[in-house]
Amino acid sequence: FNLVRMGSLLSGEARVLMDPHVVNVLPFLSMLMGNYLSTFGVLLLCTQYRALALRRQASQDPLTGLLNRRGFMERCVTAPKQGALVVLDLDDFKQINDRHGHEVGDRVLAAVGAYLAGQEDLVASRFGGEEFVLLLPEGDALAQQTRCEQIRQGIATLPLDGIQVTASLGLVPYARGWHLDTLFGQADRALYRAKRSGKNRVCLPA
């Protein structure tokens, strides 16, 4: 009896679902729930994208697209245990701004940033003004100095509408147990040596 009754109920439900004169709420509810979930998914995706964009904006230099100071410091947390820190400063950049205007100066900075961004073996950042900071991969001091010379020469030959741009670089190789503040102090001293020695060169700390 129960099986017969159950069959009758199921048969009756089937007839109701197939009756064109009867409003079936199940597809409507399903569509409504699907639209809700779809809208929620889009909103969640937009929220995640906005959060990612804000994080990127907080760690990226808007002019060059390189890491800014904050982004570089965050990257240093996962930096290799061995490598080299380089502080790069464009020589006499104030004269470029004074002579050609800040718009041209910005184009120079953007061009240098694009050049550094294209060097896939290093991490490049702009700390502000005409100062850039790089992380070179592991290697001996001679190889790292040679790499810095290549970077210096690459900047000196950038096509900048007749504007000659040179850079001085302070290089500090590091190994296990390095401390970032100490490295920056040594790199700044190396950069000062490069400036004092005539600019447009690579120097190690004294």
Each language-model region and where it sits:
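Heptad-repeat coiled-coil signal-transmission/dimerization helices
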Residues: 72, 76, 86, 109, ...
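Conserved nucleotide-binding and Mg2+-coordinating catalytic segments in signaling enzymes
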Residues: 55-74, 88-102, 110
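Signal-transducing coiled-coil linker helices
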Residues: 5-14, 18-62, 70-82
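Alpha-helical scaffold within the catalytic cores of cyclic-nucleotide enzymes
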Residues: 113-114, 143-161, 188
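Conserved helix-loop-beta segment at the catalytic/binding core of cyclic-nucleotide signaling proteins
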Residues: 59, 113-143, 153
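Catalytic-core segments of nucleotide cyclases and related cyclic-nucleotide turnover enzymes
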Residues: 142-145, 172-206
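Nucleotide second-messenger and two-component phosphorelay signaling modules
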Residues: 76-88, 99, 115-123, 157-161, ...
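Catalytic core regions of nucleotide second-messenger enzymes
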Residues: 126, 155-174
